[in-house]
Regions:
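Long lumenal/extracellular ectodomains of secretory and single-pass membrane proteins
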Residues: 1-318, 328-495
Length: 495
């Protein structure tokens, strides 16, 4: 009876009435499946989800936290990490102290500043001071320095809280405000941060040596103030003569400024892109890291109305950018194709010579309506049944990128979309392709499957790095999570 009660109590419905689950039956897996999709959620909601995971298994929860922040091997989620780290410092400070020295390694030095005013403040300031002294010593010997000075707050900043933090740090370092400021100036000069050049209107720097975020963030300043040299650099990037760093950029960052539902033509969904912007976008997109797959996999992209609800980033931007990226980098038989769905599914073959051409083309198919994922499964099954397609020619895997607020099943509203699709395929002599449910906006606590379902995994976030993780990963939700966080990269992270 207890198991029946648990099963019944775990039932809920999506915003569109589809039967689904409140939880995967693991709080850690619930967090893993959504931690990359919480950017629009409140601090309190983020904390509540982490508290449950931390209570279930502290070590797993801590590894999940650092995986979420990891800008090189994980999801690159900054705000969620800082919210949780601040909560931990106030409630479980020992878990923070054990991992303080790893924060900058997985993220940035300024992530540590969220610990100001917490029981971990003193230890955090000591970590900063130790690195600061190492950098000053290295500077005296004309050596390399860390990026600490780039991220430390300035005492002459315009924001009052930033100034207060800077003064507190200077005091802990044993420096006057003036000495602290001079030290930062010297260290930042050694780092050669591009902001110094822009402030002084000095455009003699080497574009090929600038970090990816800065290159994209300041592209309009380059166009405006150094158009000839910047244009020449972009041409050399396109011919392979120069390298443009884009290793920490996510595809949505190139799509987000230009994709629009409100304020654009309903037929295009695109804002105007200038000729100079086109050159910059095309070169940057071509320079993104390549996460390829050789499997017969196809991405399924949700373009329903809720994907355009106000959020930063817009879920539709994330989904469309990932769909376009994956289709281009897919080396299987579905290369340059993906399925877009809302009221009905559309198989889209990507056309266009450049990124801007291709983005504009695929955006023109957007149908901002309901969330009929059942029709996607029906399209694949009908195509197979009517043409006697053997199992091995079906997609081996479907990567469904969505906010998971699916419509209810038309023929059996009491079944979840996953179970309904599974039953339909089996009734016609087929096995349902493996499914990756990729959440890009977790507004509600609900999950499409539970932890021990076979042939399915749950992921979340904006990074294409997940494509390579799910290619050869264990196709069981809980086992896949463990496979990711038990990687050697997170071995040293403990509670």
């Amino acid at each position: 009876m207890l198991n029946y009660l648990k099963k019944e109590a775990n039932k809920t419905v999506t915003e569109n009435g589809a039967v689904t689950h409140i939880t995967t039956e693991s709080d850690c897996l619930d967090l893993f499946a959504t931690i990359g999709a919480l950017r629009r959620e409140s601090d309190q909601e983020i904390e509540a989800r982490f508290i449950r995971a931390y209570t279930e298994n502290r070590d797993i929860a801590m590894k999940l936290l650092f995986f979420a922040r990891d800008i090189r091997g994980g999801l690159g989620e900054r705000r969620v990490f800082k919210v949780i780290l601040n909560w931990l410092a106030k409630n479980e400070p020992q878990s923070v102290r054990k991992n303080l020295t790893y924060v900058a390694e997985y993220g940035r030095f300024d992530d540590l500043l969220c610990l100001m005013g917490t029981p971990c403040e003193k230890e955090m300031l000591s970590v900063l001071k130790e690195q600061f002294e190492k950098d000053r010593l290295s500077l005296e010997n004309s050596g390399e320095v860390s990026l600490l000075a780039k991220w430390l707050p300035s005492v002459n900043a315009s924001n009052a809280q930033t100034v207060r933090n800077a003064k507190k740090i200077a005091k802990h370092f044993g420096l006057s405000d003036a000495s602290y400021r001079k030290a930062l100036v010297a260290l930042r000069r050694q780092i050669r941060i591009i902001e110094n050049n822009l402030r002084e209107k000095d455009y003699t720097f080497d574009y090929s040596k600038q970090p990816s975020k800065a290159m994209y963030k300041y592209r309009k300043a380059f166009m405006r103030n150094d158009s000839e040299r910047y244009g020449d650099f972009l041409k050399k990037v396109s011919t392979g003569e120069e390298k443009l760093h884009a290793d920490t950029l996510a595809p949505y960052e190139l799509v987000e400024p230009y994709l629009s539902y409100h304020g654009s033509s309903d037929s295009t969904f695109m804002r105007k892109i200038t000729e100079q912007e086109k050159d910059s976008l095309n070169a940057t997109w071509a320079s993104l890291p390549k996460f390829e797959t050789k499997e017969n996999v196809i991405a399924v992209i949700d373009t329903s109305g809720s994907m355009y609800w106000d959020a930063k980033p817009l879920p539709a931007s994330v989904a469309l950018s990932l769909g376009l990226y994956f289709a281009e980098n897919n080396t299987g038989i579905y290369k340059n194709h993906f399925i877009e769905f809302s009221r009905k599914p559309q198989l889209i073959e990507i056309k266009g010579e450049t990124f801007v051409d291709r983005l504009r083309y695929v955006a023109s198919f957007n149908e901002v309506a309901n969330t009929n994922i059942e029709a996607v499964f029906d399209l694949i099954l009908k195509s197979a049944v009517e043409n006697n397609v053997p199992q091995e020619e079906l997609p081996a895997k479907l990567i469904i990128i969505s906010d998971m607020e699916f419509d209810c099943c038309v023929e059996n509203a009491k079944m979840s979309n996953f179970n309904n699709a599974k039953a339909k395929f089996e009734a016609n002599g087929y096995k349902l392709p493996e499914i990756v449910f990729w959440n890009v906006a977790s507004r509600n606590r609900q999950q499409p499957v539970t932890k021990n379902e076979q042939g399915v995994v749950l992921v979340s976030g904006c990074t294409p790095r997940l494509f390579s993780m799910v290619e050869s990963g264990n196709m069981n939700p809980y086992a896949f999570m463990l496979e990711v966080i038990e990687n050697e990269r997170y071995a040293k992270i403990v509670a």
